[in-house]
Amino acid sequence: MRSPVRDLARNDGEESTDRTPLLPGAPRAEAAPVCCSARYNLAILAFFGFFIVYALRVNLSVALVDMVDSNTTLEDNRTSKACPEHSAPIKVHHNQTGKKYQWDAETQGWILGSFFYGYIITQIPGGYVASKIGGKMLLGFGILGTAVLTLFTPIAADLGVGPLIVLRALEGLGEGVTFPAMHAMWSSWAPPLERSKLLSISYAGAQLGTVISLPLSGIICYYMNWTYVFYFFGTIGIFWFLLWIWLVSDTPQKHKRISHYEKEYILSSLRNQLSSQKSVPWVPILKSLPLWAIVVAHFSYNWTFYTLLTLLPTYMKEILRFNVQENGFLSSLPYLGSWLCMILSGQAADNLRAKWNFSTLCVRRIFSLIGMIGPAVFLVAAGFIGCDYSLAVAFLTISTTLGGFCSSGFSINHLDIAPSYAGILLGITNTFATIPGMVGPVIAKSLTPDNTVGEWQTVFYIAAAINVFGAIFFTLFAKGEVQNWALNDHHGHRH
């Protein structure tokens, strides 16, 4: 007897158009074992790669505190008196051998923001190049270049603010190709019914990189000095690159150690989804409403993500008035929750498709709604509860944690609608989604001149409203099947 839940899940207009060859009604290849498989080895190596990507991105946020002369930052102290002190001030005695710089708050903002000015430039070129030559070398050298540049951060800082800003922008150029390149690789490696699992494992490394690198950078600064933060993470990046080049291949056909059974399983599952066209159908891509649904969702999600990533430590310190030790731990807690949520939601999403017969579109909608509406609700709640420290931390943690559901929602929808051009599509959406990282924190700072609870409520309400709009837009206009323009004959209809 058929489950009515399954029937409902399929009743979204996709019954005859969901081009996922492993769904019921199409030939089903027996899944190749997971243990020691080439595709899961790729996911694990990618996990550590994106761990390093985010460690290299956020380590400066911690090191900068130790790089700047405390007398300079005291002039910019904006700690609010709206909430009472609830922890005793601590005296931090640690290694002070690192050089100090006279950088005011505005200069520090330019240093931290310069990364995104490079990052936004290489999104679309990265996706295009990956679609032509493969993502392995592009991703590898993108991280290697960023790691090597990170090693030169102390020298650049000594030379002045200008060289340091240029260095960070160059690091952004290197990291800008990483996500599009990875998407391009998964278009050849991820069977449709394993996409959520494989991609959530890969990209969850970014969240864990944030969780670990924030407190670890603080520990390195405490016991050594800030220069070793950059030497440590830069060296780790170089070691990862050597493993990546040795163990990974662009496609299953090129992999030297993949089993014949696994290779045939992957290739057969993707047989009706990939295009052999050499030219990129730019006009149909840019006219595609499902692509713009992802753009809007990606932009909306990142507005909240980057606002919290850059300003959560500020909110913890200046409004909730946690001391520096508590702040480091509590600011990383939401990303630990998000990491766990990404891993678990990937498993759940693929189970809904494989075992419960939910359509691709239905799963992407459900997970995007949870991952965007949920954070919006708890962000608003965090603004309402004011100085209740425990609830504020709990709500902000839950908000960021629920955002992890999006890793199985709009975040991988590029592979559903155009697997052959997934890297290019991610480059397009991530270009727009980088804008919040550049302007969101600036707008938030301008909205909180007096650092009152009411001003921060406005910041949270705006982020929540943008999230809700993105969720609704994606739900209305997203698709879950390969689009006609992404197939060999994009002027005809594929049956």
Swiss-Prot record:
GO terms for biological process: amino acid transport; monoatomic anion transport; monoatomic ion transport; neurotransmitter loading into synaptic vesicle; response to bacterium; sialic acid transport. It is a multi-pass membrane protein. Pfam families: MFS_1. Its main location: membrane. The modification Phosphoserine is found at S3. Coiled coil: none annotated. One of its GO terms (cellular component) is glutamatergic synapse. Residues 1-41, 131-136, 180-200, 249-279, 350-365, 413-423, 479-495 are cytoplasmic. Keywords: Amino-acid transport, Cell membrane, Cytoplasmic vesicle, Disease variant, Glycoprotein, Lysosome, Membrane, Phosphoprotein, Symport, Synapse, Transmembrane, Transmembrane helix, Transport. It comes from the Eukaryota. A motif (Dileucine internalization motif) lies at residues 22-23. PROSITE patterns: MFS. Multifunctional anion transporter that operates via two distinct transport mechanisms, namely proton-coupled anion cotransport and membrane potential-dependent anion transport. Electroneutral proton-coupled acidic monosaccharide symporter, with a sugar to proton stoichiometry of 1:1. Exports glucuronic acid and free sialic acid derived from sialoglycoconjugate degradation out of lysosomes, driven by outwardly directed lysosomal pH gradient. Receptor for CM101, a polysaccharide produced by group B Streptococcus with antipathoangiogenic properties. It is linked to Salla disease: Sialic acid storage disease (SASD). SASDs are autosomal recessive neurodegenerative disorders characterized by hypotonia, cerebellar ataxia and intellectual disability. They are caused by a defect in the metabolism of sialic acid which results in increased urinary excretion of unconjugated sialic acid, specifically N-acetylneuraminic acid. Enlarged lysosomes are seen on electron microscopic studies. Clinical symptoms of SD present usually at age less than 1 year and progression is slow. Infantile sialic acid storage disorder: Severe form of sialic acid storage disease. Affected newborns exhibit visceromegaly, coarse features and failure to thrive immediately after birth. These patients have a shortened life span, usually less than 2 years. Belongs to the major facilitator superfamily. Sodium/anion cotransporter family. This is Sialin. It comes from Homo sapiens. The gene is SLC17A5.
